[in-house]
């Protein structure tokens, strides 16, 4: 049994298999996942686990060089945007319309579904390198 880090076997495997510039997405309970995109469903109840709990745990093991967020988060969920910026203070942020973010999920290695119930709590993480 793993002693530290992500203990969910599917999430751990996806993070371990990431290469430079690969994408991984994490999102709220309502985000539609395109057919063909691997979905890792962690949601067990409303707000359980939260988006930020999952993001913070993934960030312990994954080097991120850029993130993609929905433009709408700026007006519709500024508190969550602030949480994300605090978790990734030195990472480039790219905004796109929510409709484009949804389409971009087809390019991610997996989508991790949380129990989050706040709007636009979705992110695409672009993997960096550790050297």
UniProtKB/Swiss-Prot annotation:
Source organism of the structure: Limosilactobacillus reuteri (strain DSM 20016) (Lactobacillus reuteri)
Name-wise, this protein is D-ribose pyranase
Q: List the disulfide bonds.
A: none
Q: Name one GO biological process term.
A: D-ribose catabolic process
Q: How does it assemble?
A: Homodecamer.
Tell me the superkingdom of the source.
Bacteria
Annotated GO molecular function terms are: D-ribose pyranase activity; intramolecular lyase activity; monosaccharide binding
Catalytic activity, as annotated: beta-D-ribopyranose = beta-D-ribofuranose
The signal peptide annotation in the UniProt record is: none
The entry's localization annotation reads: Cytoplasm
Family that this chain belongs to: Belongs to the RbsD / FucU family. RbsD subfamily.
CC annotations in GO: cytosol
Listed A to Z, the keywords are: Carbohydrate metabolism, Cytoplasm, Isomerase
Instruction: Give the protein's biological function.
Output: Catalyzes the interconversion of beta-pyran and beta-furan forms of D-ribose.
Which HAMAP family does the record associate with it? D_rib_pyranase
Active-site residues, as the UniProt record annotates them: 20 (proton donor)
Biological or metabolic pathway of the protein: Carbohydrate metabolism; D-ribose degradation; D-ribose 5-phosphate from beta-D-ribopyranose: step 1/2
Q: Which residues bind substrate?
A: 28, 98, 120-122
Instruction: Show the PANTHER family listed in the entry.
Output: D-RIBOSE PYRANASE (PTHR37831:SF1)
Q: What are the EC numbers? A: 5.4.99.62
Magnesium in keyword set:
no
- Gene field: rbsD
């Amino acid at each position: 049994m793993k002693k530290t880090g992500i203990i969910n076997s599917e999430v751990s495997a996806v993070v371990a298999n990431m290469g430079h510039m690969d994408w991984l997405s994490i999102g709220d309970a309502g985000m539609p996942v395109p057919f063909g995109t691997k979905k890792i469903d962690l949601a067990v109840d409303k707000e359980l686990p939260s988006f930020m709990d999952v993001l913070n745990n993934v960030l312990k093991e994954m080097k991120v060089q850029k993130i993609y967020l929905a433009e709408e988060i700026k007006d519709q969920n500024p508190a969550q945007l602030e949480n994300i910026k605090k978790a990734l203070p030195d990472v480039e942020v790219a905004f796109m319309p929510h409709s484009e973010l949804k389409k971009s999920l087809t390019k991610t290695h997996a989508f991790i579904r949380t129990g989050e119930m706040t709007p636009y709590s979705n992110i695409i993480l672009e993997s960096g390198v550790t050297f």
